[in-house]
Amino acid sequence: MDMDVMMISMCILASTFMAPGWASTSGFLRVPQSQSIVENEAADFGCEATDSASYLHYEWLHNGREIAYDKRVYRIGSHLHIEAVQREEDVGDYVCIATSLASGAREASPPAKLSVIYLESASVQLLGSNRNELLLKCHVEGASGDEPLQIEWYRDSARLASWGNVHLEEHRLLVRQPSPSDDGLYRCTASNAAGRVMSKQGYVYQANIKCLPRLLKKNQKLPESWGKQTFLCRGKRGGSGGLDQALSPAPEDLRIVQGPAGQLLIKEGDSAALSCLYELPAELQNQRIQLRWRKDGKLLRHVELGGALPIPGHAHDSGKDALLREDARLVLHKQNGTLSFASIIASDAGQYQCQLQLEGHAPLNSSPGLLEVIEQLKFVPQPTSKNLELDAAVAKVHCKAQGTPSPQVQWLREGSLNSSLPDQVEVDINGTLIFRNVRAEHRGNYTCQASSSQGQISATVSINVVVTPKFSVPPVGPIETTEQGSVVMHCQAIGDPKPTIQWDKDLKYLSENNTDRERFSFLENGTLEIRNVQVEDEGSYGCTIGNSAGLKREDVQLVVRSTGDGFAPEETGGDGFLVTRAVLITMTVALAYIVLVVGLMLWCRYRRQARKARLNELSIKEAGGDQPDASVTNGKGSEQEPCLSKQRNGASGKPKSKSNGDAQKSDDTACSQQSRSSKKSVYEQLVLPRSGLSELLQIGRGEFGDVFVGKLKASLVATSAQSDKDADTEKQHSNSENGSGGSGSGSGSGSTTLSTLNEKRRSKTSMDDIEEIKEEEPEQSALEQLVLVKALNKVKDEQACQEFRRQLDLLRGISHKGVVRLFGLCREKDPHYMVLEYTDWGDLKQFLLATAGKVNTATATSSPPALTTSQVLAVAYQIARGMDAIYRSRCTHRDLATRNCVISSEFVVKVSYPALCKDKYSREYHKHRNTLLPVRWLAPECIQEDEYTTKSDIFAYGVLVWELFNQATKLPHEELTSEQVIQRSQAGTLEWTVAEATPDSLKEILLSCWLANPKERPSFSQLGSALSKAMQSVAEK
């Protein structure tokens, strides 16, 4: 019976598979469907001919060719599965072919098309620009399948829509009759299922306006042709106002033969050159002609071509529209107008244009050129290993990569792809590895891979699942015992890894090596047992538990009673008397406590009101009016200034006393907390009005904000100097009063000794002492003082605020000619400004590069001569004296290098703190543990333990002297990457050698600056003495 049924089925199947093929798709129950898949996601094509699948064989064709199956593309039954679709390999038509095993008949399904959705980059292209319209196109490298790309346009930061004279048509933006209100930076964004990208470079548009030019000469008359149609056009501050368009055109024989190329694609780190070949007629040789290079419409570099005086600057060539930053990478060649880049960085991308400016004529512009930078593939920042708390709801490990084109990021676990990651572990679109409900099986090694057309990079991190240590049996106290008794203090903990337990007494660690083993026993479960207790055992005992997840601590007080202590029994009274006595004592103590509390409340209220009254009086005196400062009367100073409100003095000028157990802070690790007699905030004493600053020009960006160079009114400089003198006088007066008061009436010998020492100091004052104590007075004849202004932009970043306060405290307490002065602090509104002394020659490193011939001097015919050995020694000696002053003020610098020193035209060098770590000197900093650090100048203990001392400044000073003798033309260990420098420094294998030009008498002491043991390094006074002897020996030769 079964055989008959099988034969009938075979006959029906054979009749279905009619040669040469089946009719249309009637034989298919399910055919593959066309689909669009996001790149790197999976795709599935279904195919089913009849319910009797066991008598059919299925094959798949891709673009007419049979598919070769592998681990990524494979068949599941009759269906086709593609893992991680790739657009270069998988795009096309897919056909399913079913073959009958009985008859051999074949039938093919209709082709199903696979489209890959991806999105790489976007850029803005100029299609046309004139007075009547502006036409831009958003060019996108990507595909969206059947769905259109979503294009959005932005002017500056405002999103545009079709309204008024703005029209959006698919990928194009049309602005009809553009006006000054349409000026700005135009950028576009593109989005689809694969993500969203914004154009890295945009198009800067500036409307052309006919305006009245200013009179260049006295009594100059207007042309009659202007007549009544002449209007005065006032533009906003910083704008050009279109004045150039009203000037007469440039002569025809003055022309730019060749401008920058239309589009230039350069890899990051390579060199590049933008050409601007010009022709200058002989009759214009003595005219005022200036060659300018602009980037995105802003002035970048300029050089005088003619023999006359320089052309006065225009309003649009200064202030915010100028990019005249000191950058040794950029060189403008006067002979041919070429702008060359020594090493391209990502921020160099943009639109460049050169122009010739002849006095009294409109500028002659070249055609614009677009410079695009192929950013190197790298992790920003490098992924790091992490400890995850067990049962945490969400934990993330970030992996961000940058490059051109944008890289694709994926995570692997011990060689497996994303699909085989553990349960509840996923990767989001930004490449972040997300753990949900962390479990023990999540621990292991994970590798982040970033790939693009440049190649592939990877970083492996270790994920460890831990449990924060907790006390299962905490120590309980206080504990009282008698002398020669026994005490057991329990301390047990749980956690993963198993926590370690450490006991200490009065903050001094206890172990079997420093205790009496016959009396002290440390049990395995963490319990501490003390037998035969002595009086000296009394104190505060602490139990600290910890593992890789953290530390916890509990204290217990041990009180030891002498065997003779206690109350004698009452001889005459009975039990009733004892009870009555106990009740009376209890009631007396309670009443005294109540009276004490009420008295303290009244006293505190009185003191608070008196303090408010004194603050109001001080604020009225400072303001010179009758209204007190709102920050004092309302008590809102801390809300208005969250960064600087924590540094306040107490009610008295005396420092808080420390307990015996508190270790005194080292003078090498932190600034000492000196007593202050003033009750105002130390930062209120530094306040300068923001209106006193002028001509601010940004020179770079630091860790907590922008850095400017500007000018400060001389009257404010004199006021700042006088306030510093008053503060020093008041401090000396308070110190003398404290010294006399502490001696008492019976300390006449002490006062005599003090006066004798003062007489000796006055009689033995040397030139070195005068140099150290003397404060530089500002020139009274000068109306303005050149200053360096550091802005605190990251007001809500606690780490940035802490560094801002540290630099304020560093420079506030030092008055030495080798260290720049802190003129004051502008904090009426955000951002806060720190105002420091600056010099006319500026950055010491740029000065060294100029003397070495590495910096282009636009107006000079030849580079300045190189420094002699005696001059280099003089510079090093001045810096050593300044650093010695910082050491004696019990502070550390932490970033000593030639870039952070300034030099004047009088060859006076001062230690400063510009710290331009974000752009100008970004190559000299490296992000380590989420902080930008000058790793090539840091001592090993700074990198390993984050421990900064004067000895670490000595290490950096040795590197600075190495820079001086090398003219700052190369970086320390420039053959190594920053990661390799960190690794070798931590391993102790980083070898230092002095520069070749170093005198022999200095080599030994400079090599000792780089010793691994900080205690073996010399002091700044020893370095100063060695430099002084070296200068004498060089002078004698």
Curated annotation (Swiss-Prot):
Q: Which residues lie on this side of the membrane: Cytoplasmic?
A: 604-1037
Q: How does it sit in the membrane?
A: Single-pass type I membrane protein
Keyword list (alphabetical) reads:
Cell adhesion, Cell membrane, Disulfide bond, Glycoprotein, Immunoglobulin domain, Membrane, Neurogenesis, Phosphoprotein, Receptor, Repeat, Signal, Transmembrane, Transmembrane helix
As stated in the Swiss-Prot or TrEMBL entry, residues carrying the post-translational modification Phosphoserine are 681
Give the sugar-modified residues.
Answer: 336, 418, 430, 445, 513, 525
Q: Which domain of life is it from?
A: Eukaryota
Residue spans of biased composition, Gly residues class = 739-749
Q: Which ranges make up the Extracellular topological domains here?
A: 24-582
> Which parts of this chain are annotated as the region Disordered?
623-683, 720-777
Q: What GO cellular component is one of the record's annotations?
A: receptor complex
Ig-like C2-type domain: residues covered? 24-109, 110-199, 251-365, 368-464, 469-559
Q: Where is the composition biased (Basic and acidic residues)?
A: 723-734
Tell me one GO molecular function of this protein. ATP binding
- Polar residues bias spans: 658-676
Q: Where does this one sit in the cell? A: Cell membrane
SMART domains documented for this protein: IG, IGc2, IGv, TyrKc
Feature: compositional bias, Acidic residues: 768-777
Ranges for the Protein kinase domain? 693-1031
Q: Which GO terms describe its biological process?
A: animal organ development; cell adhesion; cell surface receptor protein tyrosine kinase signaling pathway; positive regulation of neuron projection development; positive regulation of phosphatidylinositol 3-kinase/protein kinase B signal transduction; retinal ganglion cell axon guidance
Cysteine disulfide links: 47-96, 138-188, 276-354, 399-448, 491-543
Secretion signal, residue range per the UniProt entry: 1-23
What Pfam families is this protein classified in?
I-set, Ig_3, PK_Tyr_Ser-Thr
Query: Where does it primarily localize?
Result: membrane
Give the family this protein belongs to, as stated in its UniProt record: Belongs to the protein kinase superfamily. Tyr protein kinase family. Insulin receptor subfamily.
Record-given protein name: Tyrosine-protein kinase-like otk
Annotated organism of origin: Drosophila pseudoobscura pseudoobscura
